[in-house]
Amino acid sequence: MKNRLVIFGLLILLMMSSCIVYHPMPIDIPLISEKNDFRVDAGISIVPSANATVSYGLTDKIAIQGFGSVGADDRYYIQAATGLYKNKGNNKVFELYGGFGYGYGNAYKDANPGNLLGDYQLYFGQANFGKISSSSSNFETGFGLKAGYLHSNLTDKNYYGWTSETGPFKIYHDESILFEPVGFIRFGGNRLRINVKLGGTLIYKFTNKDRNLPYSYLNLGIGLNYRL
């Protein structure tokens, strides 16, 4: 019964993949612990996309990170962040990042039919905490919480309702707040590990509240994580 529920949930996510502008991004939580600590993460997600993250300990306190994702229906997202990290001992690490993201989405509704498409910008902060590998274990786990301001510019090509076959079409400029919790586990070898991430998204719009922003609430990512 539980397996059927899991399969049903995954099928729903796949069916929703063409119906959304935004989805939770499977960005790596690196848990940088020292200067020159370097991680490369690459994988895929249930909401169809391929992604990669690069993270680096620039100094004894400062880390930088870059992320990119490409998906179905011409969706893409790129992000850059910088932040502070602290190795709290006993293999536990705390990170605090701030950054900017830019993306493009295209949602399709076959009831009209119509599309809602355009770009968005995200200004965010994120806190991460977790436990990294030790001499006795290669297992790593942790969680993070991202919060930010989301500005979107989406063109309504008969998505909310039929208006015209050729346009002009209305463009919605919306302001929203975004929350994204994420958890992960990494396991495998000393340097190369399998990385599994489960993330969620909650978006609250301040403008055009009668026009919902189509997005996925959950996303599951899996990939490989390499630490130099």
Regions of interest found by a model, annotated:
Residues 40-44, 66-70, 80, 96-104, ...:
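Transmembrane beta-barrel strands of outer-membrane/channel proteins
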Residues 31-35, 57-63, 104-110, 160-165, ...:
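Flexible, solvent-exposed coil segments and beta strand-coil junctions
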Residues 50, 60-66, 87-94, 136-141, ...:
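Repeated loop/turn-to-beta-strand initiation elements of outer-membrane beta-barrel proteins
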Residues 36-38, 46-52, 62, 76-82, ...:
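Hydrophobic, lipid-facing positions within transmembrane beta-strands of outer-membrane proteins
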Residues 72-135:
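Ligand-binding grooves and catalytic loops that recognize ribose/phosphate and carbohydrate rings
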Residues 19-74:
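Short glycine/proline- and aromatic-enriched beta-strand/turn motifs that initiate or cap beta-hairpins
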Residues 1-26, 228:
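Cleavable N-terminal export/targeting peptides
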Residues 109-228:
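Outer-membrane beta-barrel transmembrane domain signature
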